[in-house]
């Protein structure tokens, strides 16, 4: 019986959240299905967006007898008190028994039991750790700026606080006041940041909906708001202590000379904070620069086929009307014939398109090679093709011939291998004419290698191609394997190609849905989604750090200029020109900048090694990135110094001296 459970999203989208849909019949692929339930909004499969849940053996009723086909993954919930090690031991015993009962298909199989979280996060864990670290560095820079601001504020209020201390205000009261002011600034900044994050997360999800696992579940909610409030409060207290202690120190009650000497010491403290800001910004800028360099390199990597003007459409034939190879092959032949009859259009089919990440692999045996123990056989990725696939995709032929219409179910089983297959398994021999078969077949079917084609980046532009064999669809298809990818090359990438594909499909089967249609250029771009996400997000953090560091050095230099107004006025009255004043003030700032950049370079040299797994074709210590970032940061920081220096050079010496 065909029963289906609706996902929450499609229930809301297509049926408006109507609870009466339960028990009713809907048409899926032209066949009636009974709705028996609706999933809650909180449920989602770890790696996929799913709208409909159906019984496995209804969707694939003939898959069970083919024991050599292993394409399913299981999810277990451990009983209370059962450890992962115990579960692995139990599962190993089950697989050993399966191998004894079915040696031709299951002998040598080893289960891999991993925590679901590890399976979901996978290689994203390092990216997440780096992004969290980047957030922490930006927070530290912001906190240093807050401390700098408060120390400048305390220095400006020196007279007021000295009088209050002289009149009996306790140290605790003065420290409390400064801490309250810091907390107010931090909480207001945190509130503004939360509002910006609510907007930023929406923009991020619209641009990168699937860059990381479960990214769609990220949002600015009450828990995030509470964390933001507590983090703002904690940082205000932590980084408000130094200004508060300065405000309550005994030197505030001193004479003017002592106050000025204290101001000099405070200036040194603020300078140290600025140096730390520049160093932290340097680390973030280097990290962002490396990821941008990686992205630039990946975009120049040839995928192994020509993407321009090629459209890909996913076609999944419903089991209710296409339950055997004959009906499936008839549909595919008619579709290819209809499309290839259109002027300037060429079409073909393949089991999985390049860069999709989807692939089927088989353990295999090469004829004439020494026997290999069951379970130790090498594996190879298999791709079933139909039509003139290699010419549609313009994948170069290196040796032998391509697959053609003469390769039928009744003829010799043949295959075309890629160059990676030749390099790994036939490094010193001619692969043409050699035969291979799948391991664990009840009735072995030998595949003769008739051609060699160029490598195609199937698993990503950063991933090297693995050994693969292309076989004719009619020779490799199974009754249960009803999905395929249609690839169509049109005249000059015609914008109407997608509508043409839909029209041709509807002409053969009006009820058949097409899940997705994408240009291959888009497929290539989508394969870089995670790299673009990492690079752009870290660049945003680095730009924020650069801005904060420049604000910090601007504030320190502005405070320095204000403190030295009398000195500058005297020097200008004695003949010092504006240019000399600017040079000397900028030189003071350059000392801080050089020290910060030096410390930042040393820190980045060590920390960027943690990013090695995210880098492709770029060394963690890439000299061009380090030098370029150092020059960028130096230029921005010098500009932040020049503005207050320029203002100082324009003061009227007589006005300053009269004020003093």
What are these regions (language model features)?
Residues 133, 171-176, 180, 223-227, ...:
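Alpha-helical membrane-protein architecture signal
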Residues 147, 183-252, 290-293, 588-647:
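Small-residue-rich transmembrane alpha-helices
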């Amino acid at each position: 019986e065909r029963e289906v459970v609706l996902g929450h999203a499609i229930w809301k989208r297509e049926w408006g959240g109507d609870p009466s849909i339960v028990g009713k019949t809907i048409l899926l692929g032209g066949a009636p299905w009974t709705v028996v339930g609706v999933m809650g909004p909180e449920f989602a499969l770890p790696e996929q967006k799913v709208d409909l849940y159906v019984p496995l053996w209804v969707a694939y009723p003939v898959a069970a007898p083919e024991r050599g086909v292993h394409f399913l993954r299981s999810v277990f919930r451990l009983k209370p008190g059962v450890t992962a090690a115990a579960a692995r031991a139990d599962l190993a015993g089950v697989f050993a028994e399966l191998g004894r009962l079915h040696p031709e298909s299951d002998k040598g199989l080893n289960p891999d039991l991993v925590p679901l979280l590890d399976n979901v996060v996978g290689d994203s864990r390092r990216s997440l750790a780096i992004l969290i670290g980047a957030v922490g560095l930006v927070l530290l820079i912001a906190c240093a700026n807050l401390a700098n601001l408060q120390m400048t504020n305390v220095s400006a209020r020196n007279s007021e606080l000295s009088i209050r201390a002289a009149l009996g205000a306790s140290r605790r009261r003065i420290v409390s006041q400064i801490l309250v002011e810091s907390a107010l600034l931090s909480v207001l900044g945190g509130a503004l940041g939360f509002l910006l994050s609510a907007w930023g997360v929406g923009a991020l999800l619209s641009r990168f909906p699937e860059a990381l696992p479960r990214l769609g579940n990220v949002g600015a909610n009450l828990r995030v708001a509470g964390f933001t409030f507590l983090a703002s409060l904690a940082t205000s207290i932590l980084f408000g202590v130094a200004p508060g202690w300065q405000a309550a120190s005994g030197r505030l009650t001193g004479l003017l000379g002592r106050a000025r000497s204290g101001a000099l010491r405070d200036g040194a403290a603020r300078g140290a904070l600025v140096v730390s800001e520049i160093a932290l910004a340097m680390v973030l800028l280097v990290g962002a620069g490396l990821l941008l360099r990686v992205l630039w390199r990946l975009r120049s990597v040839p995928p192994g086929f020509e993407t321009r003007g090629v459209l890909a459409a996913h076609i999944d034939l419903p089991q209710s009307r296409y339950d055997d190879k004959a009906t499936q092959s008839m549909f595919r032949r008619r579709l290819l014939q209809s499309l290839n009859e259109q002027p300037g259009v060429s079409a073909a089919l393949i089991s999985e398109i390049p860069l999709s990440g989807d692939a089927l692999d088989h353990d295999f045996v090469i004829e004439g090679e020494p026997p290999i123990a069951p379970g130790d056989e090498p594996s190879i990725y298999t791709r079933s093709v139909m039509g003139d696939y290699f010419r549609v995709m313009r994948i170069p032929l290196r040796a032998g011939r391509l697959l053609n219409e003469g390769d039928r179910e009744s003829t010799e089983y043949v295959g075309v291998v890629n160059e990676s297959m030749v390099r790994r398994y036939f490094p010193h021999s001619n692969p043409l004419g050699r035969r291979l078969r799948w391991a664990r077949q009840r009735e072995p079917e030998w595949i003769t290698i008739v051609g060699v084609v160029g490598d195609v980046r199937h698993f990503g532009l950063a991933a090297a191609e693995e050994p693969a064999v292309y076989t004719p669809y009619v020779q490799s298809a199974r009754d249960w394997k009803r999905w395929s990818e249609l690839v169509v090359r049109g005249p000059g990438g015609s914008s109407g190609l997608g509508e043409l594909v839909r029209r041709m499909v509807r002409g053969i089967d009006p009820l058949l849905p097409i899940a997705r249609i994408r240009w291959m250029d888009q497929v290539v771009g989508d394969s870089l989604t995670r790299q673009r996400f990492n690079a752009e997000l870290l660049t945003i953090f680095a730009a924020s750090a650069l801005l904060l560091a420049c604000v910090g050095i601007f504030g320190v230099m502005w405070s320095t200029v204000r403190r030295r107004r009398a000195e500058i006025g005297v020097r200008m009255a004695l003949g010092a020109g504006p240019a000399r004043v600017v040079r000397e003030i900028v030189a003071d700032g350059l000392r801080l900048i050089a020290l910060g950049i030096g410390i930042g370079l040393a820190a980045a040299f060590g920390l960027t090694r943690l990013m090695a797994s995210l880098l492709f074709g770029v060394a963690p210590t890439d000299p061009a990135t380090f030098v370029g970032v150092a020059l960028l940061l130096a230029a921005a920081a010098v500009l932040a110094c020049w503005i207050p220096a320029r203002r100082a050079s324009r003061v009227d010496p007589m006005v300053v001296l009269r004020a003093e």
